[in-house]
A protein has these predicted regions:
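Conserved, mostly hydrophobic/aromatic
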Residues: 1, 12, 62, 123, ...
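Catalytic cores of alpha/beta
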Residues: 1, 49-64, 104-118, 166-183
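Glycine-rich, proline-tolerant flexible connector loops at the mouths of alpha/beta enzymes
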Residues: 8-27, 72-76, 128-134
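Hydrophobic faces of well-ordered beta-strands that scaffold small-molecule active sites
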Residues: 9-11, 39-45, 68-72, 97-101, ...
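A short alpha/beta connector and helix-capping loop motif
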Residues: 17-50, 54-55, 172-188
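Alpha-helix-loop-beta-strand connector modules within alpha/beta enzyme cores
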Residues: 22-44, 88-102, 140-161, 202-209
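Glycine-rich phosphate-binding active-site loops on the catalytic face of alpha/beta enzymes
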Residues: 70-78, 124-135, 178-201
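Histidine/lysine/aspartate-rich catalytic loop segments that bind and position anionic ligands
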Residues: 100-141, 147
Length: 209
């Protein structure tokens, strides 16, 4: 990916509790940063209470490894009153804090108020249920993207919208039309053949121009 000129990476982290899989990717994050410090890493924390443990928290660990953006799920915070604590912690490390919106969550006043309160400029819309691969894309994501884009324009906010999961060569074009900035989907490009892998990336780049 890096050899092909890609500079932005979405990295999943799982603790086996919030999702059933354990995804420990500390070495991967370190490696990407070591290759080029300008590589931009989005860390997707699918972990329970990622702010707990202070110096041993997931937020602390991945901040120190060089993550540029760290996003959390509000459902992963046992005490909803601590959502603010987690976002503040991310920002205290000089990182961009983000919120992941799950398939069954809507763009509501609670979300918009949190965005304004903590000056959140990155929201990720899940296109599939969290923690599961190979799922069908939920088209409600497109309407959520429109709602967020209208909100951002009204508030004159430079909000970056990302879609994660369920993407294919057709719906990525729709996502772009509906105001999405970033697309995270390994299934779009993955291949055991390096030639095919490069071809897939080039096709996507061409389609999104």
């Amino acid at each position: 990916s890096i050899e092909l000129g890609l500079k932005r990476f979405h990295i999943d982290v799982g603790d086996g509790k919030f999702i059933n899989r354990v995804l420990n990717v500390e070495n991967k994050v370190s490696y990407i940063k070591e290759l080029n410090q300008s590589n931009n890493i989005h860390v997707h924390l699918m972990t329970m209470n990622p702010h707990h443990g202070k110096d041993k928290s997931y937020i602390n660990r991945y901040s120190n490894l060089g993550a540029d953006r760290i996003g959390i799920h509000r459902k992963s915070i046992t005490n909803r009153n601590e959502i603010s604590d987690a976002l503040v912690m991310i920002k205290s490390y000089g990182k961009e804090a983000g919120i992941f919106l799950e398939v069954d969550e809507m763009v509501d006043e609670n979300l918009l108020n949190t965005i304004k309160k903590h000056n959140i400029n990155w929201v990720v819309l899940m296109g599939v249920p969290v923690g599961f691969g190979g799922q069908f894309f939920n088209e409600q994501v497109l309407f959520k993207a429109i709602t967020l884009r209208k909100f951002a324009l009204k508030e004159k906010r430079n909000l970056k919208i990302e879609v994660d999961g369920g993407l294919d060569r057709d719906n990525i074009i729709m996502c772009k039309k509906f105001g999405v900035d970033y697309l995270a989907g390994w299934s779009l490009v993955k291949s055991s053949n390096i030639g095919e892998y490069k071809k897939n990336i080039n096709i996507i780049k061409k389609n999104l121009k």
